């Protein structure tokens, strides 16, 4: 089956042609603004000028006639509206002219599926990093789920914005990578990981301040990469444990960065996960990836009429069924993204020793700082939670030099393992989170892997929590929990309804927090 795919969500218009056996052609034309970032109307004008040319060239390279095409696929979203409209119009015109079926493709889905095809990955956790997108994605329950993403700007846009202020033209990423190789001094930048999500606006603000103060651009570039990439790899590792996968795949324009590739590969070696890299020729937006996703969708029985092909600039990957994926499920025992757990004895009491292990992918200086800060913070948050009557482990010993905590054992099952069989437990979770929040305590990583269900609801691994939390911090807790539940259960809305009823009943400011949760979702410009 020969599929023609058209990509045009942002700065690139591209046509790819492939079948089940080979990629026959992939032709692209990229809009490069003379100054500043992407101007949507100018990008669309570029696509209008080039779309016929790239289609004709791709057909020529493929050595086929237009009538040989069996299916037309195009990027339906997410992306810039003007660019999407040009692409969809061209695809519809082609499909109608050739009297062939048409199918609209989710842009991130294309990145995943071309990466899998070229690398041999079967069921990976994907780190999708580009100008507008920063997401950690895995297939669970019939769909790809977004396990973590940016809460503000995409990492590629952050790098490009810094580059513009530093006088580097678009795209700035490759030049920042070159400059970073000559950097020697690690400047302190915000390390903003919130559960499974990240935030890069603080890094940009601090980096620009360093630029104004006259710090060498090489050192700033070096510090941006080391800090931002460490955040990404940390969340990626956490996603492996949450999803039960043992493969990692990288895609998107930022995935071309050799330092990021090196860090992801090192993390994979540390946790015994297989790391796959999308061929660099296909990391950037391209038509072949749209053709590949369209091929899989069509062969799985998915069909669209012309009237179903309206563009969707906010089209999320978790809205798309992906029945062709065969899921894996790996059990990681006594391990997490932050630490290793060892059963021990503390003066006759059953205990666990939580060892915050060094991360080889992080610079030693940064790693020492992060591990030390988080262990100290976990000790503080646990103590405050116990004072508030919340079930948490007892801290028997705190060793800041060895970076270990010795804690009491909590018997029970993880929420992720019981949530389907015992959905009514969510009311109890809502009650205890309300108590936590009423005492101005946030957990910081409130996922289904950090809640234990026994005769009580108990919380573990609060190393990213706060003891004088703002409403925004409390909202991130609820947002993180909701996302982790939705990623694992098709009944997420029902489960969260039980949670929210109890949360509202036991926390006077619950509605304020839940309104901020919705605001966080609206702030997700990059989907």
Curated annotation (Swiss-Prot):
It is found in: Cytoplasm. This is Probable bifunctional tRNA threonylcarbamoyladenosine biosynthesis protein. L-threonylcarbamoyladenylate binds at residues 128-132, 160, 173, 177, 257. Binds 1 Fe(2+) ion per subunit. Fe cation binds at residues 107, 111, 128, 285. GO terms for cellular component: cytoplasm; EKC/KEOPS complex. One of its GO terms (biological process) is tRNA threonylcarbamoyladenosine modification. The active site is at residue 445. Its cofactor is Fe(2+).
